[in-house]
Structures are given as C-alpha cells and as structure tokens.
C-alpha cells in the first residue's frame, strides 16, 4: 500500500509539471521511490517466507520511516516547484518561502537516507543469521 501511494503521488505530481522547475524531480522521485518500497517489501518477504525469519519491528518501522521521509522530500520538491524553484540553478538567491520548502525537502531526504541505511543494516543482519545457521 505504501508503495502504491508514493507511486500514485508521483503520477499526480506529473500532472502539475509546467516547466523546468523542481516539480519534475518530485514526480520521478515519487514514481521511483514507490517501486523501491515495493522491492524493499519483496526482500523482506523473501527473508520471512523462504528463510523462516520473523518479521521484526525494525522491518516495519524502516518501511514506514522511509515512506514518510520520501513523502516529505517529494512534498518539499513539489512545494518548491510551485514557487518556481528551478532545477540545477546553483547560487540563485532564494526567497524565505523557497528556503522553507527546500528545507522541508532536505529534512525528508535526510529521514529517507537514514532509513535507507537502516534497510541495509537489517538486510545484512538477515544474511548473517542465514549464514550462521548453515
């Protein structure tokens, strides 16, 4: 469900693209992250179904925090695009509204990065458990 929500958000944001602002990355981040979440769930399902591991609270919370982080990230990008923030325009003087929306985007990105690293740690622990019992 989380995967479909973000994929759908990416599709809806695509309807609002009207130039070369940061609405474009908001669209493709929504679409690709939706697929990424689906693949994360698939990896967890493999560990649970084929290697008889229990679903940990960490798995559940990692998916939730990754989704929330990316949703904030995408919202910040779309919000900034609504104010006309251009892509790849370094050194531009930003208004306070743009700084706030880009800060929102950055905060969501940071949450998603930390959660993505958590995914790697969880997967490595699962591989360790598999090799430990062989």
Question: Positions of the model-derived regions?
Answer:
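Hydrophobic alpha-helical transmembrane segments of multi-pass integral membrane proteins
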Residues: 1-134
């Amino acid at each position: 469900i989380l995967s479909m929500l973000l994929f759908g958000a990416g599709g809806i944001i695509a309807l609002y693209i009207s130039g070369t602002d940061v609405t474009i990355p908001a669209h493709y981040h929504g679409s690709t992250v939706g697929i990424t979440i689906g693949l994360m769930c698939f990896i967890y399902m493999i560990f649970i179904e084929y290697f008889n591991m229990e679903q940990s609270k960490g798995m559940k919370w990692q998916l939730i925090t990754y989704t929330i982080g990316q949703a904030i990230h995408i919202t910040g990008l779309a919000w900034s695009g609504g104010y006309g923030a251009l892509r790849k325009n370094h050194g531009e003087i930003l208004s306070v509204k743009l700084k706030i929306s880009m800060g929102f985007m950055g905060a969501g990105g940071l949450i998603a990065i930390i959660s993505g690293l958590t995914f790697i740690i969880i997967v490595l622990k699962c591989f360790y458990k598999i090799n430990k019992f062989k």
